[in-house]
Amino acid sequence: MGQGVSSGQDKKKKKGSNQKPKYEPPVQSKFGRKKRKGGPATAEKLPNIYPSTRCKLKLLRMERIKDHLLLEEEFVSNSEILKPFEKKQEEEKKQLEEIRGNPLSIGTLEEIIDDDHAIVTSPTMPDYYVSILSFVDKELLEPGCSVLLHHKTMSIVGVLQDDADPMVSVMKMDKSPTESYSDIGGLESQIQEIKESVELPLTHPELYEEMGIKPPKGVILYGAPGTGKTLLAKAVANQTSATFLRIVGSELIQKYLGDGPRLCRQIFKVAGENAPSIVFIDEIDAIGTKRYDSNSGGEREIQRTMLELLNQLDGFDDRGDVKVIMATNKIETLDPALIRPGRIDRKILFENPDLSTKKKILGIHTSKMNLSEDVNLETLVTTKDDLSGADIQAMCTEAGLLALRERRMQVTAEDFKQAKERVMKNKVEENLEGLYL
């Protein structure tokens, strides 16, 4: 029986030894493995195909490259061809400068005789019969233009295309003044008249066409000194977008014969080129006084300047959108031909301000001042005070200076009182001086 048990155990061992071991997958290594960049959709994409054989796409590409290479070759060849011409052109320019010489004189072309000769003049020399060199552009030559003259032979060697006088360029205001209608105390009727005469024709000319009337050509502002004539002109320049030329009458009086009328012509020429424009002539009585027989050359030159101004105001040439504003203190001394209707259609009078206007002017000038509590603006001006707008401004300035003298940052009523006494004293002295003139 013992043998039977042992034999049964041996059979079990043999059966166990004949069974195969269970498969176990190897451990995955963490090193040397590349991550897949795409998921399962990568296998569905079409591969990139590059034409490496003769096909239509490659042929088109090569033709485009050929076109670019041919264009580059043509550009290089043209550059090589143009080099001698550029060099020759520089040499010709040097020869031209040598022929012209240096320095050059400036003259005025009076008359063209023929294609090769002309008559020129200048304020510092007599008239000359000169030749016109062949390289001068004869299409630019016209009577009255400025030409360049050789300093020895006086031949015409060039034309000044921009023949505007530098003084005219200075007269043109690039920046509009800061004054506006709100800075003017009173003068409601004067502001309304100048708007109707100057502003409205430039901004809405169709209104005058519908009415069947021609807008005024110009206005003259006259009245006592310091009543706001120039201030109103500055406000007009601020309100409108038109070109504004400011001239003082004395600037039209020049030293040499003919310079005054020429400057007057150039002023209106520049105004016409930059239309719409406004020409403001301050102190017009400097050249616009009544004419009389005089043996003085200076007086006759002033009269010629005024005649040129009359021609520009009401000549054969239409001035278009060019308006004229004049200002003077003595309208009675002006020539009647200057201020007649047709040249100056409106005469606007500026009188000394009344009591309410004086208070408005005082309020404008004291609006930015640091006043003390004892200042009463209502009592500073009265009806009896013969004060103009400029006098009130001078009074406010003087009061501020008195406060600064005493190291104070506030202006008191006593400062205004002393300032008013000083201004009134100066006015009395000016009136007394006028009695002996």
Curated annotation (Swiss-Prot):
One of its GO terms (cellular component) is proteasome complex. It is found in: Cytoplasm; Nucleus. It comes from the Eukaryota. One of its GO terms (biological process) is ubiquitin-dependent protein catabolic process. Disulfide bonds: none annotated. ATP binds at residues 223-230. One of its GO terms (molecular function) is ATP hydrolysis activity. Residues 1-47 are annotated as: Disordered. Pfam families: AAA, AAA_lid_3, Prot_ATP_ID_OB_C. A lipid is attached at residue 2 (N-myristoyl glycine). Its main location: cytoplasm. Keywords: ATP-binding, Cytoplasm, Isopeptide bond, Lipoprotein, Myristate, Nucleotide-binding, Nucleus, Proteasome, Ubl conjugation. The keyword Calcium does not apply. There is a cross-link at residues 234, 255, 290 (Glycyl lysine isopeptide (Lys-Gly) (interchain with G-Cter in ubiquitin)). The 26S proteasome is involved in the ATP-dependent degradation of ubiquitinated proteins. The regulatory (or ATPase) complex confers ATP dependency and substrate specificity to the 26S complex. Has ATPase activity. Belongs to the AAA ATPase family. This is 26S proteasome regulatory subunit 4 homolog. It comes from Saccharomyces cerevisiae (strain ATCC 204508 / S288c) (Baker's yeast).
